[in-house]
Amino acid sequence: MSSWWQKAVVYQVYPRSFQDSNGDGIGDLKGIIQRLDYLAYLGIDAIWLSPVYKSPNDDNGYDISDYQEIMDEFGTMEDMEILIAEAMKRNIRIVMDLVVNHTSDEHPWFVEARQSRDNQYRDFYIWSDPDSQGNPPNDLGSTFSGPAWEYSELTGQYYLHLFSKKQPDLNWENQEVRQSVYDMMNFWIEKGIGGFRMDVIDLVGKQPFKKITGNGPKLHEYLQEMNRATFGNKDLMTVGETWGATPEIAKLYSKPNRNELSMVFQFEHSGLDQQPGKEKWDLIDLSIPALKDVFSKWQTELASERWNSLFWNNHDLPRIISRWGNDKEFRVQSGKMFAILLHLLKGTPYIYQGEEIGMINYPVETIEEVDDIESINMYNVRLSQGYAKEDILDSINAKGRDNARTPMQWNDSKNAGFTSNKPWLHINPNYPEINVEKALEEKDSLFYTYKKLIQLRHEHPIVVWGTYNLVDTEDENIFAYCRVLDEQKWLIITNFQEKTTTFDLKEEPKLSLIHI
């Protein structure tokens, strides 16, 4: 039996940067409500909402101090309830971001846990005595640079944080932790949400003293327990962020009879411009044959029973047109090529805000312009290691997370129609040329390509259910594939070159053209 999310297209909203309704320079829930008609016109089926919970904002909301309250800057719980209801009136479901690998260090659990070694919340987190020299128990590193252990003077122990030191990791070995998470999830399910996107969910089975972080031995046991305790018997979509997933691992998450998740985000294609064995900042040119191999592997391996997620962009990744396309003279053409290539694959496509109008990266000239904690930490570490300042900034401009987080460009008025005040993060100065209002006026704009692709998915079962076959081409810059369902066959051809080219098919196809 099929589920709604198999036919759906999901749109990610980064609330801080989407629409400000009250003039404080920060996007909010009322701003999202104001723009629901725009999203309904685009045709999307669900909104993945980046975190809106109460947070001190060390990591832009991914450090949560109260899971059942709304961040003051974003509005109130009443605003949230109105958003859920108004979206549903437009047949749009709200998918919440579930961040339960860690909390904020300002969450009441951790505030209490750090006070003493014997209080009731101590075991909600992961603590260790220093080694004989007073150092951390091992050399686990934080994703945001530096060690993953922070010393707490108050109790003389280290606590684990795989991200910022203000994001202590929860101890999922503790059944009370797990039950508290499930209770919170049910709180939101009862409010009528459409599902959860699960932040770095592959880390919750960690065994840090064995230096196991991702894909730990109890991970799937925990997810099956979560499924039973919360969403398992409900018509919800669940997608797990799993940076280290292979197709074999992804099958464990998404095979229906295992009762875990609907699908996962895998990032194999996202690492193709990274030097092997190095960090994401260490760049190499994209290999188109490698991209074809990765997409084809995932399309083939997850062809039956399991399900793919399809995406180029999110709040952590640079804008795809700047990353792998031409964001100057061929910006629109690049955007259409990436859209067509992705949206006619099998799986559930995700659009990140602004992707549908071709928003691009915002280059910075100094570190003072950067907001992202990951980029700032990397800058300081690499500067101390002797890297040239210019080279570090080049890496930030290529891969830094602020690229995706610049405010949405609605029109050519001051501050791109995002806010009447100073925006929380710089707005790309190209907004007079790249904005929603202009895209809606131009019938051949990138926006209408996305709208058409969404319509094709809704109207043609071949896009949802058809099998995938890569088409061999002598030109490595051509990515062509077929979708086949019963007697129907679609051929999709995309060209990564900045010029017109031709290639020969081995057999004459019987095709009818669809204009996108």
Question: What are the residue ranges of the model-derived segments?
Answer:
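Conserved small/polar residues in nucleotide/adenosyl-binding loops
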Residues: 514-516
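Active-site and adjacent substrate-binding regions of carbohydrate-active enzymes
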Residues: 1-510
